[in-house]
Amino acid sequence: MAITQERKNEIIKEYRVHETDTGSPEVQIAVLTAEIAALNEHLREHKKDHHSRRGLLKMVGRRRHLLNYLRGKDIQRYRELIKSLGIRR
């Protein structure tokens, strides 16, 4: 259901802004996107798992907030990120 630490580290290496970056909006959005995809797969099998569905909605809301922040801060980085992650906005 959750993503592994190795997968999370791969995502961080791919989307980081500088060498020690783990908390930039790009990294946070990319990690949340992977977690959302994993949780979607879980919910396809377990349709009545409403507790996990609530967690999914919270993750989507957090990602939306970070995307809005990034769009206001740097529109070019925002456009590149949604294109590379395949997020429709």
From Swiss-Prot:
Keywords: Ribonucleoprotein, Ribosomal protein, RNA-binding, rRNA-binding
GO biological process per UniProt: translation
Entries under InterPro entries matching the protein: Ribosomal_uS15 (IPR000589), Ribosomal_uS15_bac-type (IPR005290), uS15_NS1_RNA-bd_sf (IPR009068)
Stretches of the chain forming a coiled coil according to its record: none
SUPFAM superfamilies found in the cross-reference section: S15/NS1 RNA-binding domain
Domain of life of the source: Bacteria
SMART domains from the UniProt entry: Ribosomal_S15
Pfam families found in the cross-reference section: Ribosomal_S15
Record's GO cellular component terms: cytosolic small ribosomal subunit
Example GO molecular function: structural constituent of ribosome
Gene3D superfamilies: 6.10.250.3130, S15/NS1, RNA-binding
Transmembrane segments: none
CDD domains assigned to the protein according to its UniProt record, in alphabetical order: Ribosomal_S15p_S13e
Subunit field text: Part of the 30S ribosomal subunit. Forms a bridge to the 50S subunit in the 70S ribosome, contacting the 23S rRNA.
Protein family membership: Belongs to the universal ribosomal protein uS15 family.
Function: One of the primary rRNA binding proteins, it binds directly to 16S rRNA where it helps nucleate assembly of the platform of the 30S subunit by binding and bridging several RNA helices of the 16S rRNA.
PANTHER family to which the protein is assigned, alphabetical: RIBOSOMAL PROTEIN S15, BACTERIAL AND ORGANELLAR, SMALL RIBOSOMAL SUBUNIT PROTEIN US15M
Protein name, as recorded: Small ribosomal subunit protein uS15
Provenance organism: Staphylococcus haemolyticus (strain JCSC1435)
Phylogenetic placement of the source organism: Bacteria, Bacillati, Bacillota, Bacilli, Bacillales
Name of encoding gene: rpsO
